[in-house]
Amino acid sequence: KEHLPNLQVGNSSRLPFAEPLTGHNTVRKQKYIDFQQPKQYWWSGGVAGFRGTIVNWVDTLVNWNDGLDIDLASELFGAMFDYPLAASYPISDYNGEATDEWFTTAIRDQTAKMIANSGGQERYIPWVGLEHFGSNWLTASELDRILAEMQSQGTMRYCYFIYNSMKPEIWDVIRKYGQPQND
């Protein structure tokens, strides 16, 4: 920034619950960058997105600790990483369609923290993606609820990430939250 002050600089990071695991300090990075692009990658399976990462952590806690069941391991994960759990959507169900409550707990919490850690809505430009190689895709309904939650918190723009083809129902959701560009 000192040498090229007119150049806009951004940086990508993980969700707030994963920052301690990945070495990101998004609040500290605010003074070095113009905007942040945290990842709203919530898929599971394959190359794990965040639901998959959470499932892997909880499964590992259970496998490594005799007598620890998945419910207690889930509570431990939530407490250790300041990640709110939705009663209607236990971590053991994370490979299936998410409930509305999950969007008003986990997604709401992590999005609010991302916006705050970025320095406000104007500096928050998240990546939004549905899948990675071999993962379980988010559905059009899940994408709609993620974008609705982001918009309700003042998100003004995002970058859509895709490796594969885009189905019409996904494009319809993206268009629903898109705004025409003024030339």
List each model region and its residues.
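Glycan-processing catalytic domains of CAZymes
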Residues: 1-183
